[in-house]
Amino acid sequence: MSSENLPPDVIKRVVKELKELNSSTLEGITLLPCEEDITNIEAVVTGPAGTPYEGGYFKARLILSSDFPRSPPKANFITKIFHPNVSKKGEICVNTLKKDWTEDLGLKHILLTIKCLLIVPNAESSLNEDASRLLLENYDDYCKHAKLFTSIHASKPIIDSNNNNENSTTTPTTTTTATTPSTNTASISSPVKKKTETTNSTTTKVQPKKSLKRL
């Protein structure tokens, strides 16, 4: 959807929020602004330390509807992730974007909520039954699967030119090499909530060390 479909006051609000996000520092979140279409917002969420997503770079997308902010934006991960609240197509299920949505909630709040979802998954709002089951029944196995997905799909840092090609990603202009997250789950405690991606990067491609079994 083009930003032309948004009312002028909403466009002004979104532009202001995007400028504030660009000028501020959100730990673990990097905005990838698109000047051509402010209704298509992308950001990279860095996997939080102490979680099975640590060391990963996950591109997320927010799509603003024509009646935003009366209706919440649609959110999805472009980067593949093994998470109970994220479907295999990348759709994100979080209460902030559903029953808890209010018009005064801003883009910053939404992005922080998505990051927090990587820290405290909610097994009850499940979009991935396999991930939800492992989270509840065998947290160590859940961590192993999540870390494997992270090492395969999210181990390389992301900078996007903000076109609409989901596969058009490059590594950032730094010499730091992405590392594969450790598979040691002993130090990670279960955060289950119940009831309730200057120089070009190296040309060496990271290949997964083992194949992913079909869940």
UniProtKB/Swiss-Prot annotation:
Entry keyword set: ATP-binding, Cell cycle, Cell division, Nucleotide-binding, Transferase, Ubl conjugation pathway
Active site as annotated: 93
InterPro entries per the UniProt record, alphabetical: Ub_conjugating_enzyme, UBQ-conjugat_E2_core, UBQ-conjugating_AS, UBQ-conjugating_enzyme/RWD
GO annotation terms (biological process): cell division; protein polyubiquitination; ubiquitin-dependent protein catabolic process
EC number(s) given by UniProt: 2.3.2.23
UniProt GO MF annotations: ATP binding; ubiquitin conjugating enzyme activity
Annotated SUPFAM superfamilies: UBC-like (SSF54495)
Keyword Transmembrane helix in annotation: no
Family under the similarity heading: Belongs to the ubiquitin-conjugating enzyme family.
Name of this protein: Ubiquitin-conjugating enzyme E2 S
Annotated gene: ube2s
